[in-house]
């Protein structure tokens, strides 16, 4: 999948959350989306997920303009966030079976495999409502592992994960990119995502102020980051 964003803008009344964003993403890119609170990161992710519509501009996948009503394209997009939709009145296993049917993915063995990968195989019969926030996040990882979206968007995924959960998440993201997917992750854990990602995009006041792929002779993304984010931001 090739993702192209052209002149993308989003206004809420008189407030512009995004202004004239132009970005292109190639298969295999794992991009960090960085910036201070209110920079427009979540707005951009929600636009890419088809959850809101742009005021101006376009989003194209492989040359085809994306509209929220395009269910075929929607099935190629995953959005992992603290508000990732899970059915709390269903069990862990029932959730994965439901989403597998919705996205037309294989059941049974694949579900077992993905629950085992996030260490939830023994909890398949537990109701999601009874899980901790960290375990719900692991279930979301299993869900998107199963569904294999071509574009995976993540909004602050680290908050409720313990150390082993973080490792599971990052292994999954690297595997997604290795198979040709695109991953865009918004996070305030700057040093962590810059070590993980091969591209960094910084938003400030709704505009792209920095966009570079990881390359030498940069010793690390950490040093580059401080030059482009306004002083005092995380």
Predicted regions, residues:
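Catalytic Walker B motif of ABC-type/P-loop ATPase nucleotide-binding domains
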Residues: 152-155
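H-loop/switch region of ABC-family ATPase nucleotide-binding domains
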Residues: 187-188
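Helix-to-loop junction immediately C-terminal to a conserved catalytic motif
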Residues: 49
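The feature captures the beta-strand-to-loop junction immediately N-terminal to the Walker
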Residues: 34-36
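Conserved ABC ATPase "signature" region
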Residues: 97, 108-123
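Conserved ABC transporter NBD signature motif
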Residues: 57-68, 73, 210
């Amino acid at each position: 999948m090739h993702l192209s964003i052209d002149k993308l803008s989003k206004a809420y009344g008189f407030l512009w959350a995004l202004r004239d964003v132009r970005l292109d993403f190639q298969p295999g890119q794992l991009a960090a989306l960085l910036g201070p609170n209110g920079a427009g990161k979540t707005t951009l992710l929600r636009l890419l997920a088809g959850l809101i519509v742009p005021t101006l501009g376009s989003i194209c996948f492989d040359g085809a303009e994306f509209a929220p009503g395009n269910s075929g394209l929607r099935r190629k997009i995953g959005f992992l966030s603290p508000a990732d939709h899970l059915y709390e009145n269903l069990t862990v296993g029932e959730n994965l079976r439901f989403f597998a049917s919705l996205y037309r993915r294989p059941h049974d063995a694949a579900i077992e495999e993905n629950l085992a990968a996030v260490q939830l195989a023994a909890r398949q019969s537990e109701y999601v409502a009874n899980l901790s926030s960290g375990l719900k996040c692991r279930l979301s990882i299993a869900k998107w592992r199963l569904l294999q979206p071509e574009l995976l968007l993540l909004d602050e995924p680290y908050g409720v994960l313990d150390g082993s959960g973080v490792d599971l998440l990052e292994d999954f993201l690297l595997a997604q990119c290795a198979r040709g997917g695109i991953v865009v992750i918004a996070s305030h854990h700057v040093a962590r995502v810059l070590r993980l990602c091969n591209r960094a995009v910084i938003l400030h006041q709704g505009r792209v102020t920095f966009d570079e792929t990881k390359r030498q002779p940069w010793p690390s993304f950490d040093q580059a980051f401080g030059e482009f984010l306004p002083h005092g931001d995380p």
